[in-house]
Amino acid sequence: MINLFISFFYFIKLFFKKQGIDVVFYYPKHFNRGEDNQNLFLKPLFESCKKHKISYLVFEEPDIKSDKKRHKNSIPFDFPFYLIILLRKFGFRDKSSANILLFLFLRNLKFKNVIVLSQSLIEFFRGLNEEAKIFDLQHGIIYSDKESYISDGKASSNISDNNVQLLLFGNGFKEILDLSDNTNYYK
């Protein structure tokens, strides 16, 4: 419950104060599997941002089913997340929810890039910023008919409709996608 309040105050503050950054990282907290609850998939990217003086924010999606703890340097995304879930119950798609939350309190959050794990909220982030580059970081095995990446010989609509690029672990996974995708989206 405390994370909801921390999140609420952080995002309400954005109503009054602009925050411009280069990269937003977003992921469900169940990926915090490392020492001190670090996200080991994103840790090298955080370190690279620090090394190259690239500004970034880390938002963690709540996961009530997970026993993983939050990382101390992340910002709980609880408040917007639960509003998005509520709006879904009323039939709003994530892009529409983004427009509503943009109007209410996210208009001062400016970013150029978004890196997510598990394709989390990519439609929402596309709705927040049509111009941003959105990346999904591979966190598991990709095979030729993995529906979250390939469906009926083409890139999944969640990826292609939101113009998402992939950050992959090696050329082998890129080749799998290239060979499986008849539309050449992944080329």
For each feature predicted by the language model, list its residue ranges:
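The feature marks helicase ATPase cores and/or their adjacent C-terminal helical subdomains
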Residues: 183-187
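Active-site and donor-binding regions of nucleotide-sugar-utilizing enzymes
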Residues: 2-180
